[in-house]
Amino acid sequence: MPSLKALLRGVLVAAMLVAGSARAELNIEIVGGGASRHAIAVVPFKDEGPTQGNLTPVIRNDLALSGAFRLVDPSAVANVPFVPADVRYPLWQAAGAQSIAIGKVENAAGGQIKISFRLMDVSQQKQLTGGEFTVTPDRSRQVAHAIADLIYEAITGQKGFFNTRLAYVLKSGRSYALQISDVDGQRSQTILRSTEPIISPSWSPNGRYIAYVSFASQKPVVWVQDLATGQRRAVANFKGSNSAPAWSPDGSKLAVVLTTSGNSQIYIISADGGAARRLMYNGGIDTEPSFSPDGSMVYFVSDRSGNPQIYRVPVNGGDAQRVTWEGNYNVSPKLSPDGKTLVYIRRAAGNFRVMSQDLATNDTRLLSDGSYSERPSFAPNGRMVLYSSDAGGHSVLYAATADGSSKVKLAVLNGDVQDPAWGPFNNP
């Protein structure tokens, strides 16, 4: 079984060797689904189109991605309603739809468009939610995500996450690109491009900044970049290696891993940089810090027991407590937004899989298959887990429901993706 030092070397090697060309477009493919999904029909909106905004494909993709919905084909029903009065409920009930989303697009003053939508309960024949949005046509995609959020919340009772963003690193030839995109892969932006590895992107809690590690200085340095202005600053450039940035929940601090004392150890620094405070004193290797949602604890990986395991320690220092006990190789911890569930990577029988652990009961659940999965992170509502994994010779994005009931593949066409991170609700 490899040591934690070998694991750290492996992370660097993987960052330098992931190959393949990449495009920003994602292709959503349903690869598994639970039996209890809500059946919904999303009828094409009246007068939507390329210039007015193709809304329904975005809404359908969002709902499919969530794993909570089963899409009913509206073309099989002899009813195309745009307003509630036109819905013929018996036809939709016969088609197996539990709810139906309808809407229309109209021209508005100043070159804007007005998008109206309603979500109707088929059995009760009443409106569940709805809304109207007046925007410029180029904002129609964001409106479609907002509509999907409203539908998701009306059906599940949980806040939707479709207007959040993803960050990930793409490798094309000898070029690395740190990118952000919508949850469906559209509106992608390259934040940084380099011929040297870029790893470990981490979102600030307000969504304005991304911390990451760049090797452009011929060694790992932690940077923080303002997404609005593009300005960046080195916040950890100490002697030796600087890596694994993780934001505190209030955005004021970063946990980082430094080798200034020899072995990899966890330090706390200001988000603006400055002096580093060592969190613990341990003769082994400590790495991959992650704050608890309330900011009181730091979860991390250590080889102090002989093999890589996950521990937690108070943010102001103290005794570390071991968290994972099953298996002898557990890394990459991330906490759910409510602090009740931990996801991480376990190595078993030569395969690296995403695991979920209830922190109250210590019960575990397998969330991924494939031979090599990495870097799990929760959606901001805690209902989905994002990670990358191997598929067909490439590394692609997957999103699994937190209960393991369904999974979707978000394949970057003709490319490989690594180090994904799901952004927060309050994106700018």
Task: Label every model-predicted segment.
Residues G20-A24:
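Sec/Tat signal peptide C-region and signal peptidase I cleavage site
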Residues G111-K114, R174-Q179, K219-W223, N263-Y267, ...:
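Structural motif
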Residues L26, P84-L150:
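Amphipathic beta-strand/beta-sheet edge segments enriched in Tyr/Trp
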Residues L166, G207-I210, G251-A255, G295-V298, ...:
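Hydrophobic beta-strand positions that form the internal "hydrophobic ladder"
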Residues I30-P90, A101-N107:
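Short beta-strand->alpha-helix linker/helix-N-cap micro-motif
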Residues D182-I199, Q225-S243, I269-I285, V313-Y329, ...:
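Multi-bladed beta-propeller domains
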